[in-house]
Swiss-Prot record:
Organism: Trypanosoma brucei brucei
Mutant phenotype after disruption: RNAi-mediated knockdown in the procyclic form causes growth arrest. Moderately increases the abundance of mitochondrial RNAs without causing defects in RNA editing.
Intracellular or extracellular location(s): Mitochondrion matrix
Gene it is expressed from: MEAT1
Cofactor, how bound (note): Binds 1 Mg(2+) per subunit.
Protein residues bound to Mg(2+): 65, 67
Name of the protein described by the UniProt record: Terminal uridylyltransferase 7
Length: 406
């Protein structure tokens, strides 16, 4: 091993170790969750909050954003899109924002987007929080990612941490600049491990709508074994670092060459062709739509004041589902629990930048391995313009409501 590579591996493993949450982190996050529940109890009837995202998967740092799903008495994920239910949820989120501000949360704002969210900074920990109503998919995929990480926490953890650190430094992960979010790039990184035989392919989803379930993933992971050589990597950061570095090289090489115009990123079917993804989505939405209609009809039968069923509302609700699963966007990265295209928000104008960064990473990690410098690979860039929408300018947008302590 050349000197530059050895120093690079030391640097990346030190970076990973320094990013790990302290032993008491689970207590800190639990207390944060309790504070959010206290707010929820004031805002909705019989509130329940559930954490999801990186603090559940384990692919986090102490200061990672906290994603939280809020539900309430008689909540049903099937009714989103029904005008009266959406209006009530809007009132619930507005009350939640007011109560969050009153209880000491900072920079509180309610964004009434396709997926409404209340954002704030926790006054105790400084952790940024995103609270949405009934994010069932987010909760499920976080549990699956957690199960994946548990196979070998340091191996998967170091690899994903370094991919994300690179992505954030190089504006490949920057949703506020219309590039990827962390979950999307994590999925991309995991598909490379599947191609290397270092993670099973979740090819037999058994969900009611053709989706992968937590039980599906856990069953397959229980049977999965990494190659025997990986047993020697425990408690040896030099050997572990070499294995992680190899995977980083393959990640860079893979996506520098990958034909995104034809293929999708999928943990259910790696390199699935877009036309196949279209068929899968079509069938998924057929099943989803049938169940959704049944739930709407049931709700209206029990709540005459909300009826009759508005076909325009129902069509708009299903169109919203379709909009989240386009097959013609520059990138198609499948969310494995509901087939949402997580890469859909990347604008065509960002494709060149992203491809340049994959090429740069491949060149530095492979072509110029003997000249490796950790600081240069992870050097922060600031070349991609920020998205000037509600996430960029806040109070200028009518969809954003800010709250200040009374």
């Amino acid at each position: 091993m050349n000197v530059a590579k050895r120093e690079f591996i030391r640097g990346m493993m030190a970076h990973y170790r320094a990013s790990l949450p302290p032993p008491e982190h689970s207590v800190v996050i639990h207390e944060l969750q309790k504070r959010v529940l206290d707010i929820g109890m004031l805002a909705v009837n019989k509130a329940h909050v559930e954490l999801f995202g990186s603090h559940v998967s384990g692919f986090c740092t102490p200061h990672s954003d906290a994603d939280i799903s809020l539900t309430y008495r008689n909540f049903s994920p099937w009714l989103q899109g029904m005008e009266r239910v959406d209006e009530q949820n809007n009132k619930r989120m507005t009350r939640f924002g007011k109560e969050a501000s009153a209880m000491g949360m900072e920079d509180v704002r309610y964004i009434r987007a396709r997926i409404p969210v209340v954002q704030f900074t926790d006054g105790v920990t400084g952790i940024h929080c995103d609270v949405s109503i009934g994010n069932i998919g987010g909760v499920e995929n976080s549990k699956i990612l957690c199960a994946i990480r548990q196979v070998f926490p340091d191996f998967y953890g170091a690899y994903i941490h370094l991919v994300k650190a690179w992505g954030k430094a190089r504006e490949v992960i920057a949703p506020e600049r219309s590039t990827f979010n962390s979950f999307t790039v994590t999925t991309m990184a995991l598909m490379v491990l599947q191609e290397l035989g270092l993670l099973p392919v979740f090819s037999k989803p058994t969900g009611e709508f053709g989706e992968l379930t937590v039980a599906d993933a856990e069953m397959l992971l229980q049977e999965f074994k990494l190659p025997p050589i990986y047993d020697s990597l425990h408690d040896d950061d030099e050997k572990l670092g070499e294995a992680v570095f190899f995977c980083l090289q393959r990640f860079a090489e893979y996506y520098a060459k990958y034909d995104f115009s034809a293929g999708t990123v999928s943990l259910i079917h790696p390199r699935r062709h877009r036309t196949v993804y279209e068929r899968v989505v079509r069938r998924h939405l057929e099943l989803l739509g049938s169940r959704k209609r049944l739930e709407w009809e049931k709700h209206i039968a029990e709540h005459k004041e909300d009826g009759p069923l508005d076909e325009n509302d129902f069509s708009a609700s299903m169109q919203n589902e379709t909009t989240q699963r386009p097959s013609n966007s520059p990138y198609v990265v499948e969310d494995f629990v509901n087939y949402v295209n997580c890469g859909r928000r990347v604008q065509a104008s960002r494709v060149r930048h992203i491809q340049q960064e994959f090429n740069r990473l491949r060149e530095m990690l492979i072509d110029k391995e003997s000249e490796l410098k950790f600081d240069e690979v992870f050097r922060e860039s600031d070349t991609v313009p920020r998205f000037q929408g509600f996430e960029g300018v806040g109070t200028r947008d009518h969809r954003v409501k800010t709250f200040r302590p009374q």
